[in-house]
Amino acid sequence: MDSMASPGKDNYRMKSYKNKALNPQEMRRRREEEGIQLRKQKREEQLFKRRNVSLPRNDDCMLESPIQDPDVSSTVPIPEEDMITADMIQMIFSNNAEQQLTATQKFRKLLSKEPNPPIDQVIQKPGVVQRFVKFLERNENCTLQFEAAWALTNIASGTFLHTKVVIETGAVPIFIRLLTSEHEDVQEQAVWALGNIAGDNAECRDFVLNCEILPPLLELLTNSNRLTTTRNAVWALSNLCRGKNPPPNFSKVSPCLNVLSRLLFSSDPDVLADVCWALSYLSDGPNDKIQVVIDSGVCRRLVELLMHNDYKVVSPALRAVGNIVTGDDIQTQVILNCSALPCLLHLLGSPKESVRKEACWTISNITAGNRMQIQAVIDGSIFPVLIEVLQKAEFRTRKEAAWAITNATSGGAPEQIRYLVTLGCIKPLCDLLTVMDSKIVQVALNGLENILRLGERESKQNGVGINPYCALIEEAYGLDKIEFLQSHENQEIYQKAFDLIERYFGVEEDDPSLVPQVDEQQRQFLFQQCEAPGEGFQL
């Protein structure tokens, strides 16, 4: 079979032999919002690194302090040297450049020194934030520009209301102009500020994008030879690409792909991590967006980075690869052609549960593909490890492995399904029938149904009349569990359980008590209460 089948053939193939309970859209599962909110926390951590410069040595312990809500800081006594003084206010509004610089530095130190900088106190002083913004325009005084940019960066690292103050004072267009400053310190601080602003929420992100940040930002990334500037600029770019509710305007952010594809070959793990995060955001969408990412030529390098020795690179690279294989069979094949399966097999053995889970999710979208792609997973010796995961891993990882197995039983050829049975997939699928997660119970039922359907077909062809897989399910206590599911609160589950028993395990006609009655008013099956299977429910 041609692995590059046309979409039309693909749809026909899906409809003709795949389990009707799992349509192609369900089998290929887009990523749900899992809260990789990038990353107010990360921005706070970066600001901690910046604040370290002004921390006295005996205050190093503050680095271990938890990040608190800015409101908490109002209850903490502020040392006298950390107060906003009348002299500071007077100097910042003076016409003397030296006094302006001295006052701005004092404000910057206040906003940099503590884990809980007095942002509220600063923004409540009338005209102070506006004064910082005014100083951004002082091209003849780059030191004042830098100090003002630093102060505004730290204000924008706070809550949405703090960030909003910076936006409303008109700082964003000026920061964007400063990306082309001839002073690298000013450039770096400007891009850091813009990253903080864009990273707050979708509204702030879109405001920054609509101010036409991308051309000067990409120019900065192309021309800068300073590693810290590149790190901050890539991080800001990743924040511009981030978000799903709503996502950024793809036409505004997709021009960054050429620069990202070049930066994928950076030797710096921080740069690589944020490049991969940006690519994961851009590929998290419909197939037309996935195709644009593929066309930028990043796939082979993303797959190579799955084997990187730093998990902060591996995790976003895996996320991006996983998003790409949510596309159609042809898009999935691009990743397979980059030798992704040996890398995914390696990641199934990762000590990090989150990586194992993500690898299973990625494989589940590959096994939702065509039979040649399922065969590639078989040839890669991945299914034995998946079945072990299905038996032993944490539940969230077992769920993804269950999808991978069931997808293969839905789209696989008879010999491929028989292979899964010989590996022992029936017992762990039966074990999932007692979990509390209704969706996974349905996935397990679908997998077992696909196996039983094949057995029925084989028994008719062989003229034996006995479905060989019924006995295997009974031996795994699966029949007891399926019978119990006839009293499940979920209608689809109890209907499926009833159908499986009726079709494959038979109901004795002389035992009418086993046949569910129908409530004519509610049009629902009425089942007798079954005793729970001996093993009970699992969490």
Curated annotation (Swiss-Prot):
Coiled coil: none annotated. Residues 150-242 are annotated as: NLS binding site (major). GO terms for biological process: NLS-bearing protein import into nucleus. Residues 1-60 form the IBB domain. It comes from the Eukaryota. Forms a complex with importin subunit beta-1. Consists of an N-terminal hydrophilic region, a hydrophobic central region composed of 10 repeats, and a short hydrophilic C-terminus. The N-terminal hydrophilic region contains the importin beta binding domain (IBB domain), which is sufficient for binding importin beta and essential for nuclear protein import. The IBB domain is thought to act as an intrasteric autoregulatory sequence by interacting with the internal autoinhibitory NLS. Binding of KPNB1 probably overlaps the internal NLS and contributes to a high affinity for cytoplasmic NLS-containing cargo substrates. After dissociation of the importin/substrate complex in the nucleus the internal autohibitory NLS contributes to a low affinity for nuclear NLS-containing proteins. Belongs to the importin alpha family. This is Importin subunit alpha-6.
